[in-house]
Swiss-Prot record:
The keyword Secreted applies. This is Beta-toxin Cll2. It comes from Centruroides limpidus. GO terms for cellular component: extracellular region. Signal peptide: none annotated. Coiled coil: none annotated. It holds the Pfam family Toxin_3. PROSITE patterns: LCN_CSAB. One of its GO terms (molecular function) is toxin activity. The lineage of its organism: Eukaryota, Metazoa, Ecdysozoa, Arthropoda, Chelicerata. Gene3D superfamilies: Knottin, scorpion toxin-like.
Length: 66
């Protein structure tokens, strides 16, 4: 599974500005989804890959980013 890293309290994607390989996104994806996860910056949001199937990614149901 893959998808955008989401802040569960706000419903917003984690923003990033250095597209492609991005240490911040990689670190945040691993912290939220485990050491097997990967991550990079895609379209100014942290995109995580190699996730377990039940991983929660953006968008959250009934939670819009404010």
């Amino acid at each position: 599974k893959e998808g955008y890293l989401v802040n569960h309290s706000t419903g917003c994607k984690y923003e990033c500005f250095k597209l492609g390989d991005n240490d911040y996104c990689l670190r945040e994806c691993k912290q939220q989804y485990g050491k097997g996860a990967g991550g990079y910056c895609y379209a100014f949001g942290c995109w995580c890959n190699h996730l377990y199937e039940q991983a929660v990614v953006w968008p959250l149901p009934k939670k819009t980013c404010n």
